[in-house]
UniProtKB/Swiss-Prot annotation:
The protein, known as: Baculoviral IAP repeat-containing protein 5
Residues with PTM Phosphoserine: S20
Species of origin: Cavia porcellus (Guinea pig)
Family matches, as Gene3D superfamilies: Inhibitor Of Apoptosis Protein (2mihbC-IAP-1), Chain A
MF terms (GO), sorted A to Z: cysteine-type endopeptidase inhibitor activity; metal ion binding
BIR repeats (start-end): 18-88
GO cellular component, one term: cytoplasm
Amino acid sequence: MGAPSLPRAWQLYLKEHRVSTFKNWPFVNGCSCTPERMAEAGFIHCPTENEPDLAQCFFCFKELEGWEPDDNPIEEHKKHSSGCAFLSVKKQFEELTLSEFLKLDKERAKNKIAKETNSKQKEFEETAAKVRQAMEQLAALE
């Protein structure tokens, strides 16, 4: 029987797992935003067809794209998401006590819920606007 594996969300606390997401990352050599430095700053690579350099913090879920070779990932992260608790962690994942880890992961879970809630709210508002417009068009026919 092999060693138990961590849930995917917890695997992302390990830098090497974050680095492994940077397949086809455009900035590899002679750049400030290499996969290693991006991972150190908490980012994972989640490219889309229109945003091949899209990176997201696994902890605060802030998405950034439009990276330039000289961008400093930690500074960009601080600039766009200064309240991210991951930026203030001074220990490696393996060095955290269970209590420290659970407290940290509770913050990550709160961030995830907030991002998902905001996304659903935006989706609801867009649908409501379309329905409202359709109702107004029907009312105009009367």
